Amino acid sequence: EGFYICAFRKKGMLTGSFRIPKQKNPVSETVEFKDIMRTWLKHPDQWTIRQQDRFVVAYPAKYKQLIEYLNSQFICISTGFGIGELRGKTVVPQHALSMLKDLNTKAFNKVELTLERALSYLRCEALTLPEAAAGILLLTYENVPLGFVKNVGNHCNNLYPKEWRIRKL
């Protein structure tokens, strides 16, 4: 949840002021699941939601014009943060959404975990939550969001990034 930009200047290049030109054809907002994702944010009017391939990203609306200009002028590796991934006819929330302060926790079924189960989740170990509803669940520890799982009844598919898992304690 921050704004970062990096630019390099070659020696001998001219420097000067910079203005963002007005766009003649603004980029259209065509996100199929946009209404669903807006419920995931406490203040959806403060965010711009865009689809990039099968991923959906969000960034602060106040930077919309700047980000669209930079995307049109440069090859941007990443803009915003991932809030969802389109998988067939469904959308799966991404882990970055669970870390957002503007996350609307009421939009998801929440499951409070014990310390042992929270550590098990963060190790990407198998979890079973038979008492919880089926579907996407927001896991919390002491009311702090940890991430998402997809509960399919007899087990949960862990949506925590594998490269972030705890290997040793």
Where do the language-model regions lie?
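A general secondary-structure signal for short beta-strands and their flanking turns/coil
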Residues: E1-F3, A134
